[in-house]
UniProtKB/Swiss-Prot annotation:
It is linked to Intellectual developmental disorder, autosomal recessive 13: A disorder characterized by significantly below average general intellectual functioning associated with impairments in adaptive behavior and manifested during the developmental period. Brain magnetic resonance imaging of MRT13 patients indicates the presence of mild cerebral white matter hypoplasia. Microcephaly is present in some but not all affected individuals. It comes from Homo sapiens (Human). Keywords: Cytoplasm, Differentiation, Endoplasmic reticulum, Golgi apparatus, Intellectual disability, Phosphoprotein. This is Trafficking protein particle complex subunit 9. Belongs to the NIBP family.
Length: 1148
């Protein structure tokens, strides 16, 4: 044997060994799910008997250990259970072949085997098999345990038959000689007929039968066979097998005396399969120790498993003292054989477990000392770790704590030996933790603050350093920080100046990746590492609470959120001064803090380190009321004297507040330090009264802070200034987060804005918001955030630069494009009298006169809580600085009629004034690409607008009495409507920015008239089909063509009557129109149509007919008769569509 089982105990001799292995590719999760269920069937009662069969499961077992199965039958693999995945019938033959290959590995010793197949369905599943079990999946397999019980019963049948065969051999029969692997060559050529040889054969067979009886649950019979074997083997000096017989006798006696087993707590393997360690159970490699089943427990009915009576058992069974003596004798026989080292080691371990139950520690230590010196060939690193770990556990089991710690540490160092390709730092760390009690080392810093130091500081520091290094290498920097913090806090007095520097530097390196906290760290084994506060870094000697500054007082007003209240309150805070000042820490101080305001505490500290100490995140720890600590940072010189430090915070509720201590971050480690735990501290009191206060509002925006500080004329202080740079027409949302960082709900909020820039003409709303959505979230509870969105939309008038474009036109530059290196800067160059030939360089570069600036102030007045009742409010002002650059603007606007009377073409000359290529698009046209400084014309076909349907504006209701203002307002309203319908947008792909291009300031009266939908809507129908746009009506020569003219009156007054004349003509496409068509076109009836008066929103129609005598293309021109009625209306009201009729040859 080459692989020892360090978890062996005496009761394992009565178990049957069953190997459970996967076949093919099976996930570890699925395998161990079934493996645990199989392990749950650890013992069964034999039918019609009081005997109990115990099973020991392995998911890996070295085949070379199986060769020792004749020497000790509990080492023989008698059962094989394989688990496999098979999802198709074509894979089944190969899977079954793999099962047979797996059986061949242990084939010489197997009693029976089973194959569990998951995933296969179909005809193969329906075929009855005893050695194969099919399951559709890993969830639907309820009969696994039942099949395992049947499998164990089949093992028992074979076991019982073998026991009976061996036990009933006649003395005259030839008994085979059982051998261990290394003996086979030694018996070649021996006289098999000699008496010595026969006794050897009989003695070994008796021992073998004893093993079988013990496994079959016949304890009394096994004792008898072991005694007979010992006598036979002792007579022939067969020492190896004599030792095995003695060990078997000891095992049977231990099972009798200690039915609860000898594994104890250290033998976690003895519990059910649910106790599988995560790391050990998930490895398939030689030498991996497995969790075993409890073979020493009685049956559930409490019946003794032995079929024999209790009579005579005491005579064959060894006493507890004799058990140990026989173990010593057996081990002494094993030691004679070099190849029996594993057997000797396991026997020592079994004896130690028995002695631990008997509480004979000194004798147990002798066995362990012997085990230490047993030579087991060249062990692998993993086997060394196992060996040292088990030695440590066994020493711990017998109460030798320091020696246990020694071997644990040796095992830990072996886990990370240089010869290991993948060092096991996690196992190393776990083992190092278990050595701490042996070195009188606790991981609770409170244990080092009471009394004198216990243990050897040098050894403890060495062990702490090893813990730090192991935790770092296993990828858990939080553990490294905690252990290093503990070392620095508890061992500071034992560290030299250089060691202090080294430890501090290491700690900073670790905390740069993982800061230290005050949270307990839970380790996988159930151990919890308590926090380590740095009460010595720095040392605090004096604490003093300070009064509030006057600048934090709220504003008082006569009417809450009134319009005429000054932002500077005349109220002067003057607390009542108490004259009974005391030095006691619990004395209340003679001033008050205000709820929600920043409060200050002064500490006098000094640095014990030989270098500059940087303390970050230093704040207060309080009780009595809710308190928000605002941390500070400081730097203390090396070994400094008393150094003043001011800590601030905000009380969140009213009442009495007590300053209990402070928290710090030193070397990246966060610490909570209580004043009661600081020796020699002085204070003038740490308790103060907190009066009710207002909520506190904190504003944060989505825009960057501005370097421009606005100075409103009202003298209000701007809390925050933000800036944004936009192109003209561009919109951006300013998202403001209103966070209530106070203690009271925010109940009232008023938002106002004031534009400080008045010289620029603004179109539309510069700043707009909807406060209702924000107020719907009120009252805003403490700690809550409300989002307030302000829309910033800049639409300025840059049309003044049209005059500058005219300068370029005067120079002969084409309006379709400007071939200039920097066209924009030349465009925006101010007009001067007499243009110079060579303008100075200063005018070419650095001229930013085209940028326009808008400035506004947003005021937030809010109140709530007790301050709201008392008439206080707070005021926050937000300054907004917007720089607007021109994007695109229109240099010329004109219109052209369209083919439809309800539409027209809007012609726009668009100029790109940016330095980037951009695209201009509308809702109905494709994008137009404009290079920097380029001007192009774009035509937009638009539906005409019904301006008369616009709702009345406030100006038309009498707010503006000036007719000029009324007309201006109407024009702006129409321009806004046209702008919204056109939807002209620009986009700069390189900057991913976009905006709107406005024509509001460029629409003159003529353009507006062309864009307006005529109040009289005329429709012409030929044979019932509308004629509009470019539609052509077809007819046949000689057939009358019905012509209908409809009028819809959308004006607010009655119109008509009207007389219309239809004039046909032909267009020769050369500018010549032929109206002489008397012989070609004939009217059925009159060529003049009459329409009666039409009321508002009414309709009227007139009918007529034409007869085309020849084929050809004809056009119908409808003329109005000039009379008093038609002259009163604008010409634009009489826009009839042209009619195009194609006369075709009549079909035969």
């Amino acid at each position: 044997m080459s692989v020892p089982d360090y978890m062996q105990c005496a009761e394992d001799h009565q178990t049957l060994l069953v190997v459970v292995q996967p076949v093919g590719i099976v996930s570890e999760e699925n395998f161990f799910r079934i493996y645990k269920r199989i392990c749950s069937v650890s013992q069964i009662s034999v039918r019609d008997s009081q005997r109990v069969l115990y099973i020991r499961y392995r998911h890996h077992y070295p085949p070379e250990n199986n060769e020792w199965g004749d020497f000790q039958t509990h080492r023989k693999v008698v059962g094989l259970i394989t688990i496999t995945d098979c999802f198709s019938a074509k894979d089944w033959p190969q899977t079954f072949e793999k099962f047979h290959v797996q059986k061949e590995i242990y084939g010489s010793t197997l009693y029976d085997s089973r194959l569990f197949v998951f995933g296969l369905q179909g005809e193969i599943v329906e075929q009855p098999r005893t050695d194969v079990a099919f399951y559709p999946n890993y969830e639907d397999c309820q009969t696994v345990e039942k099949r395992i019980e049947d499998f164990i019963e089949s093992l028992f049948i074979v076991l019982e038959s073998k026991r009976l065969d061996r036990a009933t051999d006649k003395s005259g029969d030839k008994i085979p000689l059982l051998c261990v692997p290394f003996e086979k060559k030694d018996f070649v050529g021996l006289d098999t007929d000699s008496r010595h040889y026969k006794k050897r054969c009989q003695g070994r067979m008796r021992k073998h039968v004893g093993d079988l009886c013990l496994q079959a649950g016949m304890l009394q019979d096994s004792l008898v066979h072991y005694h007979m074997s010992v006598e036979l083997l002792r007579s022939v000096n067969d020492f190896l097998w004599l030792g095995a017989a003695l060990e078997g006798l000891c095992s049977a006696s231990v099972i009798y005396h200690y039915p609860g087993g000898t594994g104890g707590k250290s033998g976690a393997r003895r519990f059910q399969g649910s106790t599988l360690p995560a790391e050990a159970a998930n490895r398939h490699r030689p030498g991996a120790q497995e969790v075993l089943i409890d073979p020493g427990a009685l049956t559930t009915n409490g019946i003794n498993p032995d079929t024999s009576t209790e009579i005579g058992r005491a005579k064959n069974c060894l006493s507890p003292e004799d058990i140990i003596d026989k173990y010593k004798e057996a081990i002494s026989y094993y030691s004679k054989y070099k190849n029996a080292g594993v057997i000797e080691l396991e026997a020592c371990i079994k004896a130690v477990r028995v002695l631990a139950i008997q509480k004979r520690s000194m004798e147990a230590s002798e066995f362990l000392q012997n085990a230490v010196y047993i030579n087991l060939r060249q062990l692998s690193e993993e086997e060394k770790i196992q060996r040292y770990s088990i030695l440590s556990e066994l020493y711990e089991l017998i109460g030798f704590h320091r020696k246990s710690a020694f071997f644990k540490r040796v095992a830990a160092m072996q886990c990370v030996a240089p010869s290991i390709a993948e060092p096991g730092w996690r196992a190393c760390y776990k083992l190092l933790l278990e050595t701490l009690p042996g070195y009188s080392l606790s991981l609770d810093p409170k244990d080092f603050s009471r009394g004198t130091h216990r243990g050897w500081a040098a050894v403890q520091m060495r062990l702490l350093h090893e813990l730090v290094y192991a935790s770092r290498r296993m990828g858990n920097p939080a553990l490294s920080v905690r252990h290093l913090s503990f070392l620095l806090q508890t061992m500071l007095d034992f560290l030299s100046d250089q060691e202090k520097k080294d430890v501090a530097q290491s700690l900073e390196n670790y905390t740069s990746k993982c800061p230290g906290t005050m949270e307990p760290i839970a380790l996988p084994g159930g151990l919890t590492l308590p926090p380590v506060p740095f009460t010595k870094l720095p040392i605090v000697r004096h604490v003093k609470l300070l009064n509030l500054p006057a600048s934090l007082r709220p504003h008082k007003m006569k009417s809450l959120l009134g319009q005429n209240v000054s932002t500077k309150s005349p109220f002067i805070y003057s607390p009542i001064i108490a004259h009974n000042r005391g030095e006691e820490r619990n004395k209340k101080i003679d001033f008050q803090w205000v709820q929600g305001d920043v409060c200050e505490v002064q500490l006098m500290v000094y640095n014990p380190m030989p270098f500059e100490l940087r303390v970050e995140n230093m704040g207060l720890l309080t009780s009595g009321v809710e308190f928000e600590s605002l941390p500070a940072a400081l730097s203390l010189p090396a070994e400094s004297g008393l150094y003043p430090v001011t800590l601030v915070g905000v009380p969140q509720t009213t009442g009495t507040i007590t300053v209990n201590g402070y928290h710090t971050t030193v070397f990246g480690v966060f610490s909570d330090c209580l004043l009661d735990n600081l020796p020699g501290i002085k204070t003038s009191g740490s308790t103060v009264e907190v009066i009710p206060a207002l909520p506190r509002l904190q504003i944060s925006t989505s825009l960057p802070r501005s370097a421009h500080s606005l100075q409103p004329s009202s003298g209000d202080e701007i809390s925050t200034n933000v800036s944004v740079q936009l192109y003209n027409g561009e919109s951006q949302q300013l998202i403001i987060k209103l966070e209530n960082i106070g203690m009271e709900p925010l109940e009232k909020l008023e938002v106002t804005s004031k534009v400080l820039t008045t010289k620029e003409k603004l179109y539309g709303d510069f700043l707009s918001w909807k406060l209702e959505e924000t107020l719907a979230q009120f009252p805003l509870q403490p700690g809550k955030v409300a989002t307030f969105t302000i829309n910033i939309k800049v639409k300025l008038d840059f049309s003044c630069q049209e005059n500058l474009l005219q300068d370029l036109s005067d120079d002969g530059i084409s309006v379709s494009g400007f071939p200039l290196s920097s066209p924009f800067r030349q465009v925006v160059r101010p007009r001067v009298e007499g243009k110079p030939v060579n303008p100075p360089e200063s005018n070419k570069a650095g001229d930013y006169s085209h940028v326009k600036t808008l400035e506004a102030v947003l005021n937030f007045k809010y109140s709530g809580g007790p301050g709201h009742t008392e008439g206080y409010y707070r005021n926050l002002s937000l300054g907004l600085h917007v720089e607007v650059e021109p994007s695109v603007f229109f240099t010329r606007v004109s219109t052209l009629p369209a083919t439809s009377t309800r539409q027209c073409h809007l012609l726009l000359d668009v100029f790109n004034s940016t330095e980037h290529e951009l695209t201009v698009s509308t809702r109905s046209s494709e994008a137009l690409i404009l290079h920097a400084g380029e001007c192009q014309r774009m035509a937009i076909q638009v539906d005409k607008f019904n301006f008369e349907s616009f709702p009345e504006s406030p100006g038309e209701k009498g707010q503006f009495a000036n007719p000029k203002q009324l007309e201006e307002e109407r024009r702006e309203a129409r321009g806004l409507e046209i702008h919204s319908k056109l939807g002209i947008c620009w986009r700069i792909p390189s900057l991913k920015r976009s905006g709107e291009a406005s024509v509001e300031g460029l629409l003159n009266q003529l353009v507006l008239e062309h864009l307006q939908l005529a109040p009289l809507q005329w429709d012409v129908l030929v044979d019932g089909q509308p004629c509009d746009r470019e539609a052509v009506a077809a007819c046949q020569v000689g057939d009358p063509v019905r012509l209908e003219v409809r009028l819809t009156n959308r004006s607010p007054r009655s119109v008509g009557p009207f007389a219309l004349t239809v004039v046909p003509f032909q267009d020769h496409q050369n500018g010549v129109h032929n109206y002489d068509l008397h012989d070609t076109v004939s009217f059925v009836g009159s060529s003049t149509f009459y329409l009666d008066a039409v009321q508002p929103s009414g309709q009227s129609a007139c009918l007529g007919a034409l007869l085309f005598l020849y084929t050809g293309d004809f056009f119908l021109h409808i003329r109005f008769h000039e009379d008093s009625t038609s002259k009163e209306l604008p010409p634009s009201w009489f826009c009839l569509p042209s009619v195009h009729v194609c006369a075709l040859e009549a079909q035969a």
